[in-house]
Amino acid sequence: MKIVENIDSLKKELNISREKNLKVGFVPTMGALHAGHISLIKKAKQTCDVVVVSIFVNPAQFGPKEDLDQYPRNIETDAKFCEDAGVDIVFVPQEQEIYPITDDTLHISYPKYTTRLCGSFRPGHFDGVLLVMTKLLNIVDPDVCF
């Protein structure tokens, strides 16, 4: 299992797989892995040749008074879960890698759905989820996402 921390390294690894026509599966997470994540990883292993798991606590889906700093982070434990489950690549980017400091700001909103469920009392939560998922899917460019 390889642990990569930046987009360029991830793309190099994935290009090797794509040159061999291997099917890439992607399991995006915020870490704190549990049995639900492991079941997704196992399904990805059954379906795909290469499995990528991202571990990124997305600040864009936390409101200003929410507990971003308290969200559990234990890369060592999560990496062990991934290794035991047969993950090929763990992508662990820093915030600057996903949200570089630039003058360009991307915003994605889908009000029909982003105001439902916890979005009704957590303004911007699902906008943040949409944004990070768009970015991660464009970075990993998987054949299948779980």
Residue ranges, per PLM feature:
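Nucleotidyltransferase catalytic core that binds NTPs
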Residues: 2-146
